[in-house]
């Protein structure tokens, strides 16, 4: 029997990607926004992140969320600091102001210059790498973006991600070392670190001081091995079922992970995320399965 760890000042949400995949509309394209948010609430979650099917008008979105007592935790932003700083900065400012109007406190940033996460390229064979100069340029840009967002009440959290220039623990540590902790924090994604071959507890110990947002998923190792053997892309891997919800895959040290979060007084959102094919993995069923698993390990 695992000890249940108390996490103070934590909220638990679920990402809309369980229902509809923004990168592959064929996955859950027939599922409505209302179905998704009603099922999030039914499964016991307090909030969510923004997906493509969400209303773009903040007043309408807030009204719909209020029906189910849900909050917006954050939203993804595709960064192009290395390749197109000025336009990207303008887009970022608009994005942050939208999030602020929704009551969010965090913006999820991922540098997409050279990214293959949405392309039909072998994920491991064609992984992009940033030069030292590109790391420096990215860090300087992140400091500027993060300083601006902080002035407007939004914290920038960097998302390490498969198929990008910042995927591994080493790459994540490098960008954190180069950036100002006052302006740049980290979103810790258990699924992406595990997918990259990292141990989530080891990574957590190394990075805990910078973590302000967390995505929780699980992985299926046999599917990752298949992806490597067949030279599949990131999105093909998703379709094959590489990811699932916490407790349903091969990450076995979640109890220790949550113990460390509690002992380090983590504050912020925990967002359950697992991009799967909703025809194979019923979103409501998997959202409830994840909630049951979390409640067996933590209280909040």
Swiss-Prot record:
Keywords: Cobalt, Lyase, Manganese. The keyword Methyltransferase does not apply. The gene is iolE. GO terms for biological process: inositol catabolic process. GO terms for molecular function: manganese ion binding; myo-inosose-2 dehydratase activity. PANTHER family: HYDROXYPYRUVATE ISOMERASE, INOSOSE DEHYDRATASE. The lineage of its organism: Bacteria, Bacillati, Mycoplasmatota, Mycoplasmoidales, Metamycoplasmataceae. The keyword Manganese applies. It catalyses: scyllo-inosose = 3D-3,5/4-trihydroxycyclohexane-1,2-dione + H2O. NCBIfam families: myo_inos_iolE. Its EC number is 4.2.1.44. It holds the Pfam family AP_endonuc_2. Its cofactor is glutathione; Co(2+); Mn(2+). Belongs to the IolE/MocC family. InterPro entries: IolE, IolE/MocC, IolE/XylAMocC-like, Xyl_isomerase-like_sf, Xyl_isomerase-like_TIM-brl. This is Inosose dehydratase.
